[in-house]
Design a protein with these regions (language model features):
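Structural and coupling elements of P-loop NTPases
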Residues: 1-528
Length: 528
């Protein structure tokens, strides 16, 4: 029991969120570099003479130099075992991104110093606040021209509604970037650029009152630093660890992921402030991560991960106890016992066998087609289900048809398989079949991913016609859709589970439906 507690206390599980090109994949790689998990960082854009980014593995990602799927990466650092849930950073991200946040205990928000808070960051932040998880901010690309740091922090507070407290403070930016001032230690870490960021950065640390500092920092920047230190101490938000852990205050660090600058200080601050895995709720009860009985839930399913492994894998977030390879568990939704013989951990498309894992870890389990998003597995006499993972509303819709009617079986199998993974949502007319399918996605790129995968994995080509719908609402079970008074451009459909939904072309249609149908309850997401 003591060993179990020690192992769980070492665990940290966090997701990295950002807008495209803020440097999220680069930051992820630098964490792995410092943890010794990789010897050389890749490059995000996959240049000819360099490796592809370690966390980007799907063929379409390598072609485009973007993260489309969510990766799960683990590394050890100074006695901690850290699980990074890497979310897609491209503008056209997917529902997978949201679900990954359901498996994390906290989030690292990466912001481009020249751009500030952007659209995708806002969307992902909403999910973090819904779960009240701690959010740590890394303001990246300080070695390029950046906006005023006060302005950036004010924008985070106003746009996202969370207070900020800088843990360190930048000295200049762009070509004049001289380093950061560590507020707690009252020290300056000098910026020494590393070409390409392929090795750990050299560091030189000076006390803030060291006369030598003036040799490295321009007079104007030196004077400004003294003013900033005084201003932050007098007028800045007071640091509160309690507020950080409650998701009400975001500690802010500045740096440059590409040149490795500020990565290690950020990691140290992060580990000092975070907690081991937190309890989860199941059937109204709190499940303690330290309990001996094992429990976990599926937050992601991925099929045909590459040509070498044509298979399907369910990713489980372990919530309590210890996993052991070959253990027998109870699958709550399937109402039966199963053996977990094939379990993996992943570094991009490299797989390694997992013999044991603990609360806070993520494991991939071979799935013969029995698991769905949100499923629970447990050991012990008491069976329970963790709270369902929300199905988030798609924002783009298209009608798809199979080009070759002789391949109907492959078409249906492929579309259903990809939908079960949660990459897309599929809808059909009430009482209709699978001849014509409406596909809903959170990001438009998922249409491209769907076409690519159907062609390469199922040998099926499709016709795709965009649809004008912008809003989707689930209808409370038991509602008779046929009797509803709706605008002429509203469409009645059902999802894969047969749940009734309405598709609207604009928010006026949503308001019309609510005004004309007393007591009609419309839901923005459904529970799995």
């Amino acid at each position: 029991m003591e060993d179990l507690r020690q192992q769980i206390e070492k665990r940290r599980a966090f997701a990295i969120i950002s807008h495209p090109d803020a440097g999220k994949t680069t930051l992820t790689e630098k964490f792995l570099l410092y943890g010794g998990a990789i010897q050389q960082a890749g490059t995000v854009k996959g240049k000819k003479n360099s490796k592809h980014a370690t966390s980007d593995w799907m063929e379409i990602e390598k072609q485009r130099g973007i993260s489309v799927t969510s990766s799960v990466l683990q590394f050890n650092y100074q006695g901690y075992c850290i699980n990074i849930l890497d979310t897609p950073g491209h503008q056209d991200f997917s529902e997978d991104t949201y679900r990954t946040l359901m498996a994390a205990d906290c989030a690292v928000m990466v912001i481009d110093a020249s751009k500030g808070v952007e659209d995708q960051t806002r969307k992902l932040f909403k999910v973090c606040t819904m779960r009240h998880i701690p959010i740590f901010t890394f303001i990246n690309k300080m070695d390029r021209e950046a906006r005023d740091p006060y302005e950036l922090m004010e924008e985070i507070e106003q746009e996202l509604g969370i207070e900020t407290c800088p843990v360190n403070w930048p000295i200049g930016s762009g070509k004049r970037f001289a380093g950061v001032y560590e507020r707690n230690d009252q020290e300056v870490i000098r910026f020494i650029p590393v070409d390409g960021g392929k090795k750990e950065v050299e560091t030189e640390i000076l006390k803030a009152d060291d006369p030598k500092l003036k040799e490295y920092v321009e007079d104007e920047l030196y004077d400004k630093l003294q003013e900033d230190i005084e201003l932050l101490d007098m007028a800045g938000n007071e640091f509160s660890l309690e507020a950080v852990r409650a998701g009400k205050l975001s500690p802010v660090c500045f740096g440059s992921a590409l040149t490795n600058f500020g990565i290690e200080p950020f990691l140290k601050h992060f580990l000092n402030m975070t907690t081991p895995p937190t309890p989860r709720t199941a059937d109204g009860e709190v499940i303690d991560p330290y309990q001996e009985n094992f429990s976990a839930f599926v937050f992601k399913i991925q099929a045909n991960m590459n040509a070498r492994h044509r298979d399907r894998m369910a990713f489980f977030r372990i919530c309590s106890g210890k996993f052991e390879k070959g253990m027998e568990v109870y699958h709550y939704q399937g109402k039966k016992k199963i053996k977990l013989n094939q379990s993996k951990q992943l570094m991009a498309d490299e797989r390694s066998e997992v013999n044991e894992a603990y609360a806070g870890d993520v494991i991939g389990v071979f799935d013969p087609g029995i698991f769905s998003i949100g499923d629970t597995i447990t050991t012990g006499k008491k069976h329970f289900a963790f709270e369902g993972i929300p199905t988030f509303a798609p924002e783009h819709f298209a009608m798809i048809r199979n080009k070759d009617t002789m391949k109907r079986k492959q078409f249906v199998k492929g579309v259903e398989q990809i939908a079960k993974e949660g990459a897309i949502q599929i809808f059909t007319e009430l009482g209709g079949g699978m001849e014509e399918i409406i596909v809903g996605v959170v990001g438009v790129l998922q249409f491209e991913v769907l076409e690519h995968r159907l062609k390469n994995e199922y040998n099926v080509e499709i016709h795709k016609s965009p649809l004008p719908y912008q809003y989707i609402r689930w209808v409370k079970e038991g509602t008779d859709l046929k009797s509803l008074n709706l605008s002429s451009d509203t469409r009645k459909v059902q999802d894969l589970k047969g749940q009734p939904l309405l598709l609207f072309t604009n928010d006026w249609g949503v308001r019309w439906a609510q005004d004309k149908n007393k007591g009609l309850e419309l839901l923005e997401f459904s529970k799995n």
